[in-house]
Amino acid sequence: MSAIKVFILSDSIGETAHNVALAAAAQFSDYDIRYQRFPFVRTDSLLQTVLSQALKEHAAIFHTFVDRRLSQIVNQFCEAHELPYYDVITPALDTFSQITHVQPSNHPGTVHALNTNYFDRINAIEFAVTYDDGKNPSGFLEADVVLLGVSRTSKTPLSLYLANRNLKVANLPLVPQAQIPDEIWKVDPKKIFGLTNDPEKLNDIRRQRMVQYGLNPDTMYSNTDKIKAELEYADKIFKKIGCLVINVANKSIEETATLITESLNTDDTNNG
């Protein structure tokens, strides 16, 4: 089967439409879906050029135009030429108009404006990089979230994902022979999250990691008995701290992050 082509059109950067398309496409993993992004489409002439190309290549269209007129042009073109399309933003704008009884401002890219929220996110990302992998124990006392876990339990990618939600995250790998920094015991246990995994899953992940490095996959690093010992050690630490433990086996980064933020929000509500 030939690849499915999806055009992402927007009068801003198109990130929202792209993310929606990716989320939906994840349910169709057997298909080869290829995306082409067309950001900052704000003139009729440029829009018509892109639409003509979409028609020529039989591409589906996902779009976010806060300019209602451009949005209508796309929708009408797709309907007239029987091109599959999805208008990502218009229904949401209509819903908020109904709620507020106010028309949208129609300013493309407002969500990406350089506001306080943007700089907080940049600071959170810098924090995650600085305090990744237990580099500096002082970060544990400043963090909104502290992640603990043995090697290959998604600590670093999860830290960066949460940083994009403006949370300052520090993480620490748990190794049986290594001493736990004193700072960990001073952190509120509600801010600490223990990450674990199934031994078989972790064995597979570590073996793949060694293969990627061009090394023998059958080492002590991927040894099942050693992995079980590491997980047992980590579990003892989690119980001693009294933190929430999350098994990341078969969970996406997004799912794990949601469990963490929900736990934080619940604690905030209870303390409010």
UniProtKB/Swiss-Prot annotation:
The keyword Nucleotide-binding applies. Bifunctional serine/threonine kinase and phosphorylase involved in the regulation of the pyruvate, phosphate dikinase (PPDK) by catalyzing its phosphorylation/dephosphorylation. It holds the Pfam family Kinase-PPPase. Belongs to the pyruvate, phosphate/water dikinase regulatory protein family. PDRP subfamily. HAMAP family: PDRP (MF_00921). GO terms for molecular function: ADP binding; ATP binding; phosphotransferase activity, phosphate group as acceptor; protein serine/threonine kinase activity. Its EC number is 2.7.11.32, 2.7.4.27. The keyword Protein transport does not apply. This is Putative pyruvate, phosphate dikinase regulatory protein. ADP binds at G149, V150, S151, R152, T153, S154, K155, T156. It comes from the Bacteria. Keywords: Kinase, Nucleotide-binding, Serine/threonine-protein kinase, Transferase. It catalyses: N(tele)-phospho-L-histidyl/L-threonyl-[pyruvate, phosphate dikinase] + ADP = N(tele)-phospho-L-histidyl/O-phospho-L-threonyl-[pyruvate, phosphate dikinase] + AMP + H(+); N(tele)-phospho-L-histidyl/O-phospho-L-threonyl-[pyruvate, phosphate dikinase] + phosphate + H(+) = N(tele)-phospho-L-histidyl/L-threonyl-[pyruvate, phosphate dikinase] + diphosphate.
